[in-house]
A protein has these predicted regions:
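Helical mechanochemical/support elements of P-loop NTPase systems and associated helical scaffolds
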Residues: 5, 22, 64, 78-85, ...
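Residues that recognize and position ribonucleotide moieties
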Residues: 2-3, 56, 97-98
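Active-site loop/short helix in cyclic nucleotide turnover domains
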Residues: 13-17, 64-69
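Alpha-helical scaffold within the catalytic cores of cyclic-nucleotide enzymes
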Residues: 15-56, 60, 81-90, 94
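Broad gene-expression machinery/nucleic-acid interaction feature
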Residues: 8, 51-55, 131
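Conserved helix-loop-beta segment at the catalytic/binding core of cyclic-nucleotide signaling proteins
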Residues: 1-18
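Cytosolic regulatory/linker segments at or just downstream of nucleotide-handling modules
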Residues: 63, 92-136
Length: 136
């Protein structure tokens, strides 16, 4: 986990240049989060509490990783368009969705039940982005 932002978190997975390991790790983490969210939601319903849900956006690609910021506030983090894409994917879905870009899909398509979610305009991206949805 890189950071907490309001009711969200940002996590990244580093690996060799091929992207396979990080894409698989991100999907495994997303599935684990969604399974726990479903469990908590069921528990909360019995207790008459607010619903609990998680939105997940996963993008695979190159980013700048390292200590970023002025000396008085250096933060080890990740920046780049792939980070922005993951955030936009997160916002494009509904409660319980695990959405991914085409690059992530390429690395995990044989291991999971994934459907085409269509091409969508995402803020900050000139071209429509092909989105895929993982079903758990």
């Amino acid at each position: 986990v890189d950071k907490y932002m309001g009711d969200g978190i940002m996590a990244f997975f580093e690996n060799p240049p091929d992207g396979v390991i990080s894409a698989q790790a991100a999907i495994k983490s997303a599935v684990a989060m969604q399974e726990k969210a479903i469990e908590l939601d069921e528990k909360y319903k019995v207790q008459n509490r607010f619903p609990f849900s998680v939105y997940v956006g996963i993008a695979t690609g190159y980013a700048k990783v390292g200590n970023i910021g002025p000396p008085e506030k250096v933060d080890y983090t990740v920046i780049g368009s792939v980070v922005n894409k993951a955030s936009r994917l997160d916002s494009a879905g509904n409660a319980g969705d695990i959405l991914m870009d085409e690059d992530t899909y390429f690395f995990v398509k044989d291991d999971y039940d994934i459907e085409d979610f269509g091409s969508h305009e995402l803020k900050g991206f000139e071209k429509k982005v092909q989105i895929f949805k993982l079903t758990i």
